């Protein structure tokens, strides 16, 4: 699995846990829809740390909380 896919899955899972829509997150952090769509899409070719940090803050989480998930512990995680 690629890192960008892992980040997108983690964001999706957190949104579901928080009963929050992607649209609501976009509005809360003033992120353009196309930016979020690219990050969450299958054609995402990489993740931008600034964008990920913006999302983490919008989810009211720490960086440690966000990355503390088994999905990021996969030794075969591809850095894209």
What are these regions (language model features)?
Residues 15, 26, 56:
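The alpha-helix within a helix-turn-helix
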Residues 13, 38, 67-80:
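Short, charged recognition helix plus adjacent turn
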Residues 15, 40, 51:
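DNA major-groove recognition helix of helix-turn-helix
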Residues 43-54:
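Short, basic-rich loop-to-helix N-cap that marks the start of a DNA-contacting helix
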Residues 32, 43, 70-74:
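The DNA-recognition helices of helix-turn-helix-type DNA-binding domains
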Residues 1-21:
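A short, Lys/Arg-rich alpha-helix, primarily the initiator
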Residues 19-38:
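Short alpha-helical DNA-recognition segment
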Residues 12, 23, 53, 64:
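Residues within the helices of the helix-turn-helix
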């Amino acid at each position: 699995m690629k890192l960008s896919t892992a980040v997108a899955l983690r964001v999706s899972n957190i949104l579901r846990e928080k009963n929050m829509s992607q649209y609501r997150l976009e509005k809360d952090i003033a992120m353009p829809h196309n930016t979020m769509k690219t990050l969450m899409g299958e054609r995402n070719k990489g993740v931008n740390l600034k964008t990920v940090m913006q999302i983490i803050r919008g989810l009211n989480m720490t960086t440690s909380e966000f990355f503390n998930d088994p999905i990021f512990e996969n030794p075969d995680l591809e850095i894209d």
